[in-house]
C-alpha cells in the first residue's frame, strides 16, 4: 500500500535522527516525519500552482504548531482545544522562517506554506531543531523551487565548555542558548541568549555548531538526490529589464536627490512626486502594472543606496560607517509608574515603562515548553503613528512578539535572582517613532526603565544593529542602520549586551549566508558601539539603579521555611494565612519549596507579617518572650495563643507577682499580654508565665540583664 515509503537515518551531534517519507500526507508537495530521540515532528510543505497577483514579495507562511498532547497535557481553555499560537510557537516559526526564506527564487510569487506539527516531545531533544531540519528536508524533496538545503543546531556553554545539542539538564545550567542555521558554505541564521558571553567564545560556538550543520546539509542533499521530485516551473514575476533601465535612465538623478537626507519624512515627501510622474507617464503604456512600476522605483532606490555605500562609502544621512546617530536618554519622565525610560536614536524613539508586581502575577505558560511560569515579561508595541501611517490596531503580530522576545532575552541575564528581588517584572516598550533598530532601542529603554524602578540589575545592557552590503566578493558593514539601510541592505545583525559580553543576538539575512570574517567584524563593531552608548548616554542619564523603589510600587520581603511547615502557615481551610493577610494588610505567596513572599504598600506591614510567620514555623524556645492573645479563661489559669495554632497555659500562680484570687481579675479574653515560655513538656504542651515575662522586661529596662 505504501510503495513509496522510505526511512533515512543519520547521526546528528551524537544522537540518532530519522526521516520517514511516503507514508503520511502524500498529497503535500513534500512531507517528512522527523524522529529525534523521542521527539516527533511532522513537517509538510506545499505551494500554489499559480502566482498571487499584485504583490512584490514571496507569500511564504511558516507555522510551528504546538499540540499539548505531545507532552501529555489537556488544554486548559473552556473548549479544551489549542487556541492561538503561543509566543513560543510564534518565535519558533520565525526561527525557521529566517533561514529558509532567502533561498526561494527572488522572482517567485506562488504561495508557499510550511507547517511543522509537534506530535511528541522529548525534553532532551528540542522540537524546534527537528522542525527546522524537517522543513529543509521537506522542501528539498518536494517539487517546490528552493535553493536549499539548510540545517540548524542548538549550542550550549556549560562550565566553559561548548556543547552541541545540550540535553534538558545541560540547558538549565548553560550560559548560552544559541541556535545556528547554515547552508553547505555559510551561516544563514543566528539567534542567541547568553550570560554576558565574550565575542570570541560566541564566534567559536557559532562555528562549532556550523561544522555539525554542514554534515546534516550534506545528508539532506544525498536524500534529495535519491528521492527528490523535479521542481515545477513557476511564472517569473521579475520586472522587465528594459523597462527598469528606461525608468532608471529617466529618474535616477531625481531619486538620488530625494534619498540624500537624514530625515525619513523629507525623503518620503521627495519621493511622492517621483511616483506620481512615473504613473502619469507609464500607466497608459503598462495598464494594470502599477505594482511592477512601483517595484521599479523601489529597485532604483535600492540601486542608488547600495552604489553609494559600495562605490563611495556614503550613507544616506552622511554618517561614517561606524558612526551612530544622535542619541538621547531620559528616565523618570512618567509620574506614578514604577519606572520609565525613553531612548532616542536619530528618528527612532522608544518609551519603556517598568511595572513591579507580586510573584503570583508571574505569567503562566501553557505550552509544550519545560518552563511553566515567567517572572520577567517584556512586550513591544509599534503603533501605526510611529511611521506616520493610519491603520487600525489589531494587537501584536509576529514581528511585535519577536522584537519583544529579543529585548526580553537581552535583559534576563542581568536581572537579580528571585531571592535577591522577589518581584514579577513587566516592561512594555512603546515605539513612538520608527526609523530602524526599534528592537535595539527597546533594549536600551528597558535598561533605563528598570534602573529608574530601582531594580538592582547586575549591569546595564545596550543594543545596536550592524548592517551589510555585498556584491560578489565585496562586502561592507555599517553600524546603527536606519530604515532604508535595513530595507535595501543584506543584513540586520542585532546584538544586545553589557560591557562584559553579549546577552542576545538576532540575525536577519536577505542573502544566502555569512562568512566567519563578516560575523567577527559585526561582533567587533557592535561591541564598540554598545560601550559608546552606555558610557556617553545611558549611564549619564542614570549611573546606577535607584536605591529605593517607587512609593507606588509594592514592597516585598521574602523568607524560606521548612516545606513541612507550609501547612501550619496556611492553617485549616486557609484560616491562618487569611488572618495574617487581613490583620497585616499584606499579600502572601508560598512556593512548594518553602519560599514565602510577603508584599504590601507599607514595608512595616511586611515585617510584621514575617515576624508572625516566623513564630509559627519556629518552635517556641524556653526563656523566650512572646506577645500573645488570651483565648480562654479557666479557674486554674488562662490559655494564651503565642502564634497561630500555638497555645500555652499561664497558670493562675504565674499571672502576677502578687497573689491572684480570680483569673478574670488580671486578664480577659482578647487581651494582648507578654508571656515567657517556662516549659515544654514531653507531649509538646507549652507552659507560660506572665509574671516572669514582666520581671524579665523590667530587669532589662533597669540594665540588670
Q: What do the PLM-derived regions correspond to, one by one?
A:
Residues 106-112, 147-149, 216-234, 265-266, ...:
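Flexible, glycine/charged-enriched surface loops at secondary-structure junctions
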Amino acid at each position: 500500500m505504501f510503495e513509496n515509503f522510505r526511512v533515512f537515518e543519520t547521526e546528528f551531534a551524537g544522537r540518532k535522527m530519522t526521516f520517514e517519507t511516503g507514508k503520511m500526507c502524500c498529497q503535500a508537495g513534500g512531507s517528512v516525519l522527523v524522529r529525534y530521540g523521542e521527539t516527533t515532528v511532522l513537517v509538510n510543505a506545499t505551494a500554489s500552482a499559480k502566482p498571487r497577483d499584485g504583490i512584490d514579495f514571496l507569500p511564504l507562511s511558516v507555522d510551528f504548531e504546538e499540540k499539548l498532547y505531545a507532552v501529555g497535557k489537556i488544554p486548559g481553555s473552556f473548549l479544551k482545544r489549542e487556541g492561538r499560537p503561543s509566543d513560543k510557537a510564534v518565535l519558533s516559526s520565525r526561527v525557521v522562517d529566517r533561514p529558509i526564506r532567502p533561498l526561494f527564487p527572488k522572482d517567485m510569487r506562488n504561495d508557499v506554506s510550511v507547517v511543522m506539527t509537534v506530535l511528541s516531545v522529548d525534553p532532551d531533544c528540542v522540537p524546534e531543531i527537528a522542525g527546522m531540519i524537517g522543513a529543509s528536508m521537506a522542501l528539498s524533496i518536494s517539487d517546490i523551487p528552493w535553493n536549499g538545503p539548510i540545517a540548524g543546531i542548538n549550542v550550549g556553554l556549560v562550565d566553559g565548555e561548548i556543547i552541541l545539542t545540550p540535553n534538558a539538564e545541560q540547558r538549565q545550567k548553560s550560559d548560552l542558548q544559541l541556535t545556528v542555521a547554515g547552508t553547505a558554505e555559510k551561516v544563514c541564521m543566528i539567534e542567541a541568549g547568553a550570560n554576558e558571553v565574550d565575542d570570541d567564545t560566541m564566534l567559536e560556538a557559532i562555528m562549532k555548531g556550523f561544522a555539525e550543520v554542514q554534515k546534516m546539509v550534506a545528508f539532506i542533499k544525498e536524500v534529495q538526490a535519491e528521492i527528490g521530485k523535479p521542481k515545477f516551473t513557476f511564472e517569473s514575476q521579475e520586472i522587465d529589464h528594459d523597462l527598469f533601465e528606461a525608468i532608471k535612465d529617466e529618474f535616477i538623478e531625481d531619486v538620488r536627490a530625494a534619498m540624500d537626507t537624514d530625515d525619513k519624512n523629507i525623503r518620503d515627501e521627495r519621493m511622492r512626486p517621483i511616483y506620481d510622474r512615473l504613473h502619469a507617464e507609464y500607466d497608459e503604456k503598462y495598464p494594470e502594472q502599477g505594482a511592477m512600476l512601483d517595484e521599479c522605483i523601489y529597485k532604483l532606490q535600492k540601486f542608488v543606496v547600495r552604489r553609494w555605500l559600495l562605490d563611495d562609502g556614503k550613507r544616506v544621512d552622511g554618517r561614517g560607517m561606524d558612526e551612530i546617530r544622535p542619541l538621547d536618554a531620559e528616565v523618570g519622565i512618567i509620574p506614578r509608574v514604577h519606572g520609565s525610560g525613553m531612548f532616542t536614536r536619530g528618528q527612532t524613539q522608544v518609551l519603556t515603562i517598568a511595572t513591579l508586581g507580586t510573584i503570583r502575577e508571574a505569567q503562566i505558560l501553557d505550552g509544550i515548553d519545560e518552563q511553566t511560569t515567567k517572572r520577567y515579561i517584556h512586550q513591544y508595541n509599534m503603533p501605526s503613528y510611529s511611521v506616520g501611517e493610519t491603520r487600525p490596531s489589531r494587537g501584536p503580530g509576529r514581528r511585535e512578539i519577536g522584537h519583544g522576545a529579543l529585548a526580553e532575552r537581552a535583559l534576563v541575564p542581568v536581572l537579580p535572582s528571585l531571592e535577591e528581588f522577589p518581584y514579577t517584572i513587566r516592561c512594555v516598550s512603546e515605539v513612538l517613532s520608527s526609523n530602524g533598530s526599534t528592537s535595539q532601542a527597546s533594549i536600551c529603554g528597558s535598561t533605563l526603565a528598570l534602573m529608574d524602578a530601582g531594580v538592582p540589575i547586575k549591569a546595564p545592557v545596550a543594543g545596536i544593529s550592524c548592517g551589510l552590503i555585498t556584491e560578489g566578493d565585496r562586502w561592507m558593514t555599517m553600524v546603527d542602520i536606519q530604515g532604508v539601510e535595513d530595507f535595501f541592505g543584506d543584513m540586520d545583525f542585532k546584538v544586545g549586551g553589557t560591557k562584559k559580553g553579549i546577552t542576545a543576538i538576532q540575525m536577519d539575512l536577505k542573502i544566502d549566508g555569512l562568512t566567519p570574517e563578516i560575523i567577527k567584524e559585526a561582533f567587533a563593531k557592535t561591541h564598540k558601539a554598545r560601550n559608546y552608548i552606555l558610557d556617553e548616554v545611558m549611564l549619564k542619564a542614570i549611573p546606577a539603579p535607584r536605591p529605593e523603589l517607587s512609593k507606588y510600587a509594592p514592597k516585598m520581603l521574602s523568607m524560606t521555611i521548612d516545606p513541612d511547615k507550609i501547612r501550619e502557615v496556611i492553617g485549616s481551610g486557609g484560616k491562618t494565612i487569611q488572618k495574617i493577610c487581613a490583620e497585616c494588610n499584606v499579600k502572601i505567596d508560598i512556593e512548594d519549596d518553602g519560599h514565602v513572599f510577603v508584599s504590601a504598600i507599607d514595608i512595616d506591614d511586611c515585617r510584621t507579617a514575617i515576624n508572625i510567620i516566623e513564630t509559627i514555623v519556629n518552635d517556641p524556645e524556653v526563656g523566650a518572650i512572646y506577645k500573645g492573645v488570651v483565648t480562654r479563661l479557666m479557674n486554674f489559669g488562662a490559655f494564651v495563643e503565642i502564634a497561630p495554632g500555638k497555645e500555652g497555659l499561664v497558670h493562675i500562680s504565674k499571672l502576677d507577682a502578687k497573689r491572684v484570687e480570680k483569673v478574670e481579675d488580671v486578664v480577659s479574653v482578647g487581651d494582648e499580654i507578654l508571656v515567657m515560655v517556662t516549659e515544654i513538656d514531653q507531649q509538646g504542651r507549652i507552659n507560660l508565665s506572665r509574671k516572669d515575662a514582666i520581671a524579665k522586661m523590667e530587669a532589662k529596662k533597669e540594665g540588670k540583664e
